[in-house]
Amino acid sequence: VTDRAAPAKAPPGERRVLAALALAQFICSFAGSNMNVMINDISRDLGTTVQGVQISITLFLLVMAALMIPGGKLTDRYGRKRCFLTGLVVYAVGALLCAVAPGLGVLILGNSILEGVGTALLIPPVYILTTLLYPDVTSRARAFGVIMALGGIGAAAGPLIGGLITTAVSWRAAFVFQALVIAVIVGLSRRVRDPLPPDPERPFDTGGAVLSATGLVLIVMGILAADNDLRLMIALILLGALVLAWFFRSTRAKERAGREPLLSLALFRDRTSNLGLITQNVQWLLLMGTSFTVAAYLQVVRGYDAVRTGVIFTAATLGLLLTSLSAERLAERRSQRTLIMAGFTLSVAGVAVLVALVAAFSTPWAFVPGLLLIGLGLGVMLTPSVNVVQSSFPEEQQGEISGLSRSVSNLGSSFGTAIAGTILVAGLTKGAYAAAMITLAVIGLAGLAAAARLPRAPGRTAPGGAPSGAAPGTEARPPLPDSGQPPAPRRPHRA
């Protein structure tokens, strides 16, 4: 029986460990949102275009999506602390490279590749170590609450902090800020211990990791090519689909042969979970698509600077934080299906308000009501969608499904900046802005349709995070704000 008694106050050493893990989540969430307000400054300084910055942001999110599951698998083989520290170093090198980037190519190498790889290596250990170091439900919930709070602050305040740094110093200073935070985390990490030994003999599906990552990259690059070459777009998307089909066929063959694949196909056999994954993907697509589109429009078409753009986005930040803080109370009163549908309804309404008011008024205040509605909607539905997915599986599959869940969310983020951003940068006019936002609204309606097909009865969250009637041990893991929760730890494999 799990001991739910309140644990003693954590000693200073444990608090420093938690600070290291929470700051790691903060900086990764910050990196996912702060660049949107630097579009003009980066474009002007590096002699590139809005599309160039869009590619860098999209690829960063895509690299996270493609490598989050492999990153979680590597922790079993090489150890959680080693992967955590390696990820921090890789991330810091990428941030410093961005700070001195002479052109777009180096920025993509530093931000999209190195920071993306670093995030995929360091985020899985954050959640795995928290699960291992805080074994009782109460202390673990408190630890996850601290980590999620810092992650939420990083994601929500990223545009404002990034805008202030860019306006006061330079966009390059924002990357130096990231490197400094990483240095603090490395110092705090000296007290981090790994309760489980690494298992160098544990198999790793290298072929599966390469195939899945290649397929996702080809599809997203195809979307980015849409405004330049339609035939190239079609070719890349078709090729990506073929590579992913190859990945799933290879995975099935490995399972039949008794080998451990990158991802178990059993995760896709539950209808409720599949619908939940769709809603997660669409939610993050809406969030990042709207963020990039509105930020680019404000800076390029309206001519606003980074700090003014960041201030406007505080409306969405406040909305998201308000409903996120009320998530537990809402879950006790309404089913998860109802909350997800309400979230999509609010978010789509927010997009419609953004299109209507921005077309009618030139004041910055025209953006506030729509962004507030979108923030309120996202805050209502993000956690219920994760709970729907997590609670569909027993304890032994929680690790794999949580990794898949976060990868799907990050993939939605990259789709959002790719799809909406591509439509916007094709014209950079009011018409292109409206077209991008309407496209997001239509995709949001598709998410609403998926949510409507979720089961009606299950979903009210019982104490501990599991829906009422869920099997013991299926408590949903706390979700990440913008970069995924990894697979939970496994005991070392023995041949």
Kindly label every feature range from the protein language model.
Residues 14-37, 50, 126, 243, ...:
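12-transmembrane solute porter fold
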Residues 38-67, 103-108, 307-312:
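Extracellular/periplasmic helix-loop-helix junction of adjacent transmembrane segments
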Residues 45-47, 79, 100-106, 169-170, ...:
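Helix-breaking motifs and short loop linkers at transmembrane-helix boundaries and internal kinks
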Residues 76-207, 395:
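Helix-loop-helix hairpins in multi-pass membrane proteins, especially solute transporters
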Residues 167-280, 286, 304, 311-312, ...:
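Hydrophobic transmembrane-helix bundles of small-molecule transporters
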